[in-house]
Regions:
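Sec-dependent N-terminal signal peptides of Gram-positive bacterial secreted proteins and lipoproteins
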Residues: 2-26
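Exported/periplasmic ABC-transporter solute-binding proteins
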Residues: 24-294
């Protein structure tokens, strides 16, 4: 009989330990793990401005209030991979890069889609810009021809097929230039890069230009603009508005396409919709637990 009660007591103690462990795991699992892009990212610049994470101080200077404990990732793919592997994660990426490995939440009740971005009912959206020094284009017939292609009907079709918003529904057909010698260096935003890669493929197929003649470097928007300014890149890419200070240094900017910014979470996360204010609070660190959003 004594042995029986000893076994019962041991089982009760084990149960209490297990219950306590479950309780601890539940509490830890409720913490929101914030993932953000690096400084210089056009996606971060647009996201922080649109959500109010970027604030203006009393002296008129802007300050990015992104949560100091956020895990910083240096590309679109890095953000998606990190969020896909963490059930408590939240991040943001280009809508055009979105895939089934993560879940995009509605913002203020509006689900991101081509239609809601196009009609502007989905608020988190921004332009994809290209920029260049006109003198560089004038001295590079291949770059000039490629720019002409980017404004063509065929380019607009590629943009739409890749889930971005085209800028001209009545664009003219591409007409191949006569002098397609030389090379082009294009670089900048990791959000624009996947679309640019598709556009380069289409251009090479239409023009007969070897793909090796066009170098595509994936960095970030700020580097893209700076390298367009100093002439390292024939064409720079930015997933944000081109700044007045950048334009003042002699570059010409054109909108390539429009894109949404998707707020993403793990596929197993039950959250479906967040308000813009909730997003701001999460990414500034004011709200640290998923349960606080209920």
């Amino acid at each position: 009989m004594k042995k029986f009660w000893t076994i019962v007591i041991c089982m009760m103690l084990l149960g209490a330990v297990a219950f306590a462990a479950v309780g601890c795991n539940k509490g830890a699992g409720d913490t929101i793990n914030v993932f953000s892009r690096e400084d210089g990212s056009g996606t971060r610049s647009a996201f922080t401005e649109l959500t109010g994470v970027l604030v203006e101080g009393e002296d008129g200077t802007e300050k990015d209030m992104t949560f100091s404990g956020a895990s910083i990732q240096n590309s679109t793919n890095a953000i998606m991979t990190a969020v896909a592997q963490d059930k408590n994660a939240i991040g943001y990426v280009s809508f055009g890069s979105l895939n089934e490995t993560v879940k995009a939440v509605a913002v203020n009740g509006i689900v991101p889609s081509v239609d809601t971005i196009k009609d502007k009912s989905y608020e988190l959206q921004r332009p994809f810009n290209i920029a260049y020094k006109q003198s560089n284009i004038d001295n590079n017939p291949l770059a000039a021809d490629f720019l002409g292609f980017l404004g063509s009907r065929q380019a607009q079709e590629v943009i739409a097929a890749e889930k971005y918003i085209a800028t001209d529904d009545n664009a003219p057909a591409y007409v191949k230039g006569s002098d397609l010698t030389g090379s082009i260096t294009i670089g900048g935003s990791s959000s624009v890069s996947p679309l640019m890669e598709k556009l380069i493929e289409k251009y090479c197929a239409l023009s007969g230009v070897a793909k090796s003649s066009i170098e595509l470097q994936t960095i970030d928007s700020t580097a893209g603009m700076n390298n367009a300014i100093n002439g390292t890149f024939d064409i720079g890419m930015a997933s944000r508005d081109v700044k007045d200070s950048e334009l003042a240094q002699g570059i010409t900017a054109e909108v390539l396409a429009y894109d949404g910014i998707a707020v993403i979470i793990h596929n197993d996360n039950a959250v479906e919709d967040l308000s813009m204010e909730q997003i701001r609070q999460i990414f500034t660190g004011e709200v640290r637990e998923w349960s606080a959003l209920a």
